[in-house]
């Protein structure tokens, strides 16, 4: 018998997360490691747990995540979106609540490219009037 699970994909910056939601006791595993071990920063862990806390499902699911690309913040944001999408696949009634909190929206902000003749994307050389 196959294990029933819900799936959601999340992306942020250059990070991608594949999230699998199963009935369980609240364990969150990212790339084979527990959430607390994978993310050193508490803020990243809080970001990941937000959709579960909002829908009061912290103890009802085991979550298996595969995160790739980007850095800590990007991966945390990608996982959050993936969890939100998987929760909606599990229960459609949660969608309005999650959308209102902003968890269903893909954060479209990307790194602006460096321009030729400038130091960075917008940082130019110091201007001298004389």
UniProtKB/Swiss-Prot annotation:
Q: Please, which domain of life does this record's source organism belong to? A: Bacteria
Task: Give the GO molecular function terms.
Answer: RNA binding; structural constituent of ribosome
What Pfam families has UniProt attached to this entry? Ribosomal_S9
Q: Which GO biological process annotations does it have?
A: translation
GO terms under cellular component: cytosolic small ribosomal subunit
Q: Mind telling me which InterPro entries this protein's record contains?
A: Ribosomal_Su5_D2-typ_SF, Ribosomal_uS9, Ribosomal_uS9_bac/plastid, Ribosomal_uS9_CS, Ribsml_uS5_D2-typ_fold_subgr
Provide the alphabetized UniProt keywords. Ribonucleoprotein, Ribosomal protein
Q: Which family does it belong to?
A: Belongs to the universal ribosomal protein uS9 family.
Q: Could you identify this protein by its name?
A: Small ribosomal subunit protein uS9
- Species of provenance: Stenotrophomonas maltophilia (strain K279a)
From the broadest rank down, the organism's phylogenetic lineage runs: Bacteria, Pseudomonadati, Pseudomonadota, Gammaproteobacteria, Lysobacterales
